[in-house]
Amino acid sequence: MSLKSIAKQALSLMDLTTLNDNDTDEKVVTLCQQGNTLFGTPAAVCVYPRFIPIARKTLKAQGAEQVKIATVTNFPHGNDDIDIAVAETKAAVAYGADEVDVVFPYRALIAGNEQVGFELVKQCKAVCSANNVALKVIIESGELKTAELIRKASEISIKAGADFIKTSTGKVPVNATLESAHIMLETIRDLGVADSVGFKAAGGVKTTEEAEQYLALTAEILGQDWINQAHFRFGASSLLANLLATLNDEQVNQNVTGY
């Protein structure tokens, strides 16, 4: 595939994201407008729950209702209070989210507690299932660090009902890496759940060339045909400008953020 073809594919697989403490309605409106490109739209926009209504209104106004709205819960710290995670997930669904990205209680897993992660994901999944909302589970691979823990968090999340497993919050020093993606994609393959579970690389994917590496890795493990909006996403914000530059034959200036 040409770099332009890859850029266009990556754009269609993006969860175009703003998760900053200084987010405003205006910034979310701008994000939604930026995603409405001459080369198509992203799979989703990802915003804090309180911005779901303005995102919905903006997407509708620009005729981009096919773009899903994702949000985050138990974010970003991945605490182990199941009741709070479930309450936040219920609130996100009530705001109108199409997809919820919940943070797995990764510190509890590092400390040896596998059960709380399973229960938290299972209960959040029950809320989502009842409302036809997809659940993505952020395992925070850069904090888990070891292949063993990354695989374990992926397995627990999948067995508890995750629709996607996602690398990172974008709020820690190490976010998506090809190494962690490799382990997560192999876990999806090895558990035989490729039909029902997807993968999301989030944080740190900033260029068309980097996106290409993730797409190539995924194709190698799960096949080219597996790569579609139902199975694969990039969680990103600064990636969009680079993809558009590739598509427009322009040079791009890198703006550096965690996402």
Curated annotation (Swiss-Prot):
Biological processes, Gene Ontology terms: 2-deoxyribose 1-phosphate catabolic process; carbohydrate catabolic process; deoxyribonucleotide catabolic process
Protein name as annotated: Deoxyribose-phosphate aldolase
This protein's UniProt keywords: Cytoplasm, Lyase, Schiff base
Name of the encoding gene: deoC
Family: Belongs to the DeoC/FbaB aldolase family. DeoC type 2 subfamily.
Role: Catalyzes a reversible aldol reaction between acetaldehyde and D-glyceraldehyde 3-phosphate to generate 2-deoxy-D-ribose 5-phosphate.
GO function term, MF aspect, one: deoxyribose-phosphate aldolase activity
The keyword Secreted is assigned to this record: no
PANTHER family, alphabetized: DEOXYRIBOSE-PHOSPHATE ALDOLASE
